[in-house]
Regions:
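Structural preference for solvent-exposed beta-strand-turn elements
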Residues: 1-438
Length: 438
């Protein structure tokens, strides 16, 4: 277990890049694995979660070759060429990898067993397993197949399904659409609110027959997926920590280049702008079918805001660091409709309220969100990440504007999504204001 010590720097300025998008990296590996021919991926996120996805597709018989940093060749097995793995597949901390892989495995005529770390074994998998079972797959595991370790045995063909998802979840949607590749008819998923659409964009690029009508997505089976070139853009969820730091730290100005700004993922930018942050967007070319931009922000006086409704799925992963921004804003911020945060890597609602509270923030926990009274002066303290990478980095950002020294415990988890986070912040500060401790 490691910890990080944070002290407020005198400045935060500069231009940096962030690692490849985690969601797109997972999909590039999985879609390439079931495509015919070669998929060449550049900008792949070489962090623990996505590296575990590569291990999983290798375990299923797919040849994956590393050509250089973030550069991989995936020689796909096609829809009918995956092989039964010899051992249990361990996905570490990645809920995305497990749920998406379950969709692929639902169409394979063999048993595959999946597990993960302590945190992942607590997360709900029944939201994917239940509809896959209705399609004809067999899913067994703890708590009636709703918790890892899980065993999945697929069927061919799977039954077509029209599924009304109770949650806006790109992971659920993607799992069912992937299973639909082996179905006997169209598979339709309708969500209460539209979730991120990386799957729709990327599967279409690989050759799948998809149609989108508002909150409903339909996949019609029968098309062969073909290997593609995938240039993964920078991860907006990683950029979020730097953008918030650049907004709340005194005298700061930060530019993050090459960031994916898909509208279904860019809710944090809209929320920060609503709070008064001057977020500049310089748009460039598309990458992996996704809009890309250089993002710039600088110190600003923020004001509280109401954040809820359809914007929540567009910024669900960024709520921890958005809460840090709200602590520094003038007035009250209410975050609602975010109960999904309770079943992430940690109960993020409880963790945000409890850990930022240790720094002096005035936060009230609600069943589906948070109420934050801004303007409190943050003071350094010892805080716990709970093994949650986004909590760990959000607490580090809070430490950048707190008086004194902040120590964030259990920070190895940062490696699951942003291994270079500490080095990037120190580069912007021009000093070692963030220091890893044994």
């Amino acid at each position: 277990m490691t910890r990080i010590r944070v002290r407020a720097p005198k400045r935060l300025s500069g231009t940096v890049e962030v690692p490849g998008d985690k969601s797109i990296s997972h999909r590039a590996a999985l879609f390439g694995a079931i495509a015919s021919g070669r998929t060449e991926v550049t900008g792949y996120l070489e962090a623990e979660d996505c590296l575990n996805t590569l291990k999983a597709v290798r375990a299923l018989g797919v040849l994956v070759t590393r050509k250089g940093p973030g550069h991989y060749l995936v020689d796909g097995a096609g829809l009918f060429g995956l092989r039964e793995p010899e051992q249990v597949i361990d996905l570490g901390n990645s809920g995305t990898a497990v749920r998406l892989l379950m969709g692929v495995l639902a169409g394979q005529p063999f048993w595959t067993f999946l597990t993960g770390d302590d945190s992942l074994r607590r997360r709900p998998m029944g939201r994917v397993g239940e509809p896959l079972t209705r399609m004809g797959a067999t899913v067994v595991g703890r708590e009636d197949g709703s918790r890892l370790p899980l065993g999945v045995r697929g069927a061919r063909p799977l039954k077509a399904i029209a599924y009304d998802s109770p949650v806006a979840s790109a992971q659920v949607k993607t799992a069912l659409l992937l299973a639909g590749l082996w179905a006997d008819g169209p598979v339709t998923v309708t969500e209460p609110v539209r979730s991120r659409d990386h799957t729709e964009r990327m599967l279409t690029g690989f050759g799948a027959r998809l149609s989108v009508d508002g909150r409903t997505v339909t996949l019609t089976p029968g098309a062969e997926l073909r290997g593609q070139g995938v240039a993964v853009p920078g991860d907006i969820s990683s950029a979020a920590f730097l953008l918030v730091a650049g907004t709340i730290a005194r005298g700061a100005e930060i530019t993050v280049t090459g960031v994916g700004v898909n509208e279904t993922r860019a809710g944090l930018l809209d929320a920060l702008e609503a709070m008064g942050a001057p977020v500049g967007r310089s748009h460039g070319a598309l990458a992996a079918g996704e809009p890309v931009a250089d993002l710039t922000t600088r110190s600003a006086t923020l004001r509280g805001a109401l954040v809820g409704g359809p914007i929540i799925p567009r910024l669900i992963d960024e709520v921890p660091v958005l809460a840090v921004a709200a602590c520094m804003a003038e007035g009250r911020t209410r975050i609602t409709d975010a109960a999904e945060l309770r079943v992430k890597e940690s109960d993020r609602i409880r963790s945000i309220a409890g850990e930022l509270g240790k720094l002096g923030a005035r936060i009230t926990e609600a069943p589906d969100g948070l109420e934050i009274e801004g303007g409190a002066r943050l003071r350094g303290a010892c805080v716990q990440s709970g093994g949650d990478h986004r909590m760990a980095m959000a607490l580090c950002v809070a430490g950048l504007v707190a008086d004194g020294e902040t120590v964030v415990e259990d920070t190895e988890c940062i490696r699951t999504s942003y291994p270079g986070f500490v080095d990037t912040v120190n580069a912007l500060a021009g000093t070692r204001c963030v220091e890893e401790l044994p």
